[in-house]
């Protein structure tokens, strides 16, 4: 296999206008890979460390140190390694960093090299990235979980839940699912406008109307689904990302939700009522990131009807996921490559989840680039679900468009996950 001969990093801008790391890896057969590293707004305390410069430049968010770490420390260490030995490349970087959370070199430095190496190796093997990583049997196209109303840390809308997503479960193909989602999205704009609300957008391309409650937001989307000519619960289902750590008061031990202070038990009842009244297939981070007992209880209560997804709760970390499996806390893993900081560790987390019947949802971050790696990963790892924001804004649509290409490449072998991706329809 071709060897790494050059690694170069640079500082670029993400979709929020903040700096991030881009890395290029060159092999001795002239194969090449490039990767841009995403960044989150609501970040879990257990995530791998994203290295920022501090100071005045870019309001402290510069990544020149991470870039320097790639160019001056990581590059010499991985030069000469075979690009198809992903685990060795990642191990060399992890050993070089030496910390528990990648705080010395920066997860944003390590991940950039890790992803760019995989892309270069795929190019060298003359394979699509999804085929290189997933092998000849990778053929399942994921359900796009489109975030069409943004709240929480992603917008100034006033609603506490961070993401209101639609899942086109009734589609026969990814192409049809994308069309359905786009049609609902455009109809939602007219519904919001007709109510005299703002059609401004949040970080992930969804609308950010000033609504007072979760139910009000869901009702707006339900109206848009109907207006688009689709049946709620048959063609289109709902999914939520509560990102509840963002409205949890650690000092008081309560959730400041919709104008009141609520206990974990109260929140469990809130979610039970929502699942009862709306066709919700997935709830992400319903409780704060260290409430193991609460997650276990919630999963026991409604886990047979709905997917309970650990994002900040698991942070794509195999060790935390293992604990969750043992405690029967949550039943699905949100997969964010930059939470753990290397491709090998991401693959380990996905495999651990799937081996224990936990579903996986591949995910973008609110600060994205035009990089489409996660689209390929969602197919390579047979996730069956992906969230990449609204069907608008090019950094979001880039991933969905890549999935269109993959579906076209697979031809008759392509299978759209559809309803089978969720426990509500596939218990």
Curated annotation (Swiss-Prot):
Q: Where, by residue number, is the active site?
A: 204 (proton donor), 336 (proton acceptor)
Cofactor field: Mg(2+)
User: PROSITE patterns in the record, alphabetically?
Assistant: ENOLASE
What is the cofactor note? Binds a second Mg(2+) ion via substrate during catalysis.
Q: Identify the pathway.
A: Carbohydrate degradation; glycolysis; pyruvate from D-glyceraldehyde 3-phosphate: step 4/5
CDD domains, alphabetized:
enolase
So what does this one do? Catalyzes the reversible conversion of 2-phosphoglycerate (2-PG) into phosphoenolpyruvate (PEP). It is essential for the degradation of carbohydrates via glycolysis.
Q: Which family does it belong to?
A: Belongs to the enolase family.
PANTHER family tied to this protein: ENOLASE (PTHR11902:SF1)
What protein name does the entry list?
Answer: Enolase
Species per Swiss-Prot/TrEMBL record: Corynebacterium kroppenstedtii (strain DSM 44385 / JCM 11950 / CIP 105744 / CCUG 35717)
């Amino acid at each position: 296999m071709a060897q790494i001969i050059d690694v170069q990093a640079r500082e670029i801008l993400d979709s929020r206008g903040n700096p991030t790391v881009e890395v290029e890896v060159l092999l001795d057969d002239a194969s090449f890979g490039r990767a841009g590293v995403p960044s989150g707004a609501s970040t879990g305390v257990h995530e791998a460390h994203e290295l920022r410069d501090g100071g005045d430049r870019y309001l402290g968010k510069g990544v020149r140190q991470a870039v320097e770490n790639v160019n001056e420390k990581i590059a010499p260490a991985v030069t000469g390694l075979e690009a198809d030995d992903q685990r060795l490349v990642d191990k060399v970087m992890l050993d070089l960093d030496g910390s528990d959370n990648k705080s010395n070199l920066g997860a944003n430095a390590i991940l950039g090299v890790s992803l760019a190496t995989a892309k270069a190796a795929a190019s060298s093997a003359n394979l699509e990235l999804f085929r290189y990583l997933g092998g000849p049997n990778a053929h399942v196209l994921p359900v796009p979980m489109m975030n069409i109303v943004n709240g929480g840390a992603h917008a100034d809308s006033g609603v506490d839940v961070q993401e209101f997503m639609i899942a086109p479960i009734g589609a026969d193909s990814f192409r049809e699912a994308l069309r359905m989602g786009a049609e609902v999205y455009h109809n939602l704009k007219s519904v919001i406008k007709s109510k005299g609300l703002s059609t401004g957008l949040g970080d992930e391309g969804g609308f950010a109307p000033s609504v007072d409650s979760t139910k009000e937001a869901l009702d707006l989307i339900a109206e848009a689904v109907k207006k688009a000519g689709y049946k709620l619960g048959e063609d289109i289902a709902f999914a939520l990302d509560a990102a509840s750590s963002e409205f949890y008061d650690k000092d008081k031990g309560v959730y400041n939700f919709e104008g009141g202070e609520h206990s974990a038990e109260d929140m469990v009842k809130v979610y039970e009522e929502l699942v009862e009244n709306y066709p919700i297939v997935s709830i992400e981070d319903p409780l704060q990131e260290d409430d193991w007992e609460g997650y276990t209880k919630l999963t026991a209560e409604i886990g047979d009807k709905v997917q309970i997804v650990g994002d900040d709760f698991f942070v794509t970390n195999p060790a935390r996921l293992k604990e969750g499996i043992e405690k029967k806390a949550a039943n699905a893993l949100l997969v964010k490559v930059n939470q753990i900081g290397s491709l090998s560790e991401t693959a380990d987390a996905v495999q651990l989840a799937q081996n224990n019947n936990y579903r996986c949802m591949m995910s973008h971050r609110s600060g994205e680039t035009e990089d489409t790696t996660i689209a390929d990963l969602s197919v390579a790892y047979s996730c069956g679900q992906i969230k990449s924001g609204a069907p608008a804004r090019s950094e979001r649509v880039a991933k969905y468009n890549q999935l269109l290409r993959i579906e076209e490449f697979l031809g008759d072998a392509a299978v759209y996950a559809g309803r089978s991706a969720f426990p509500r329809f596939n218990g």
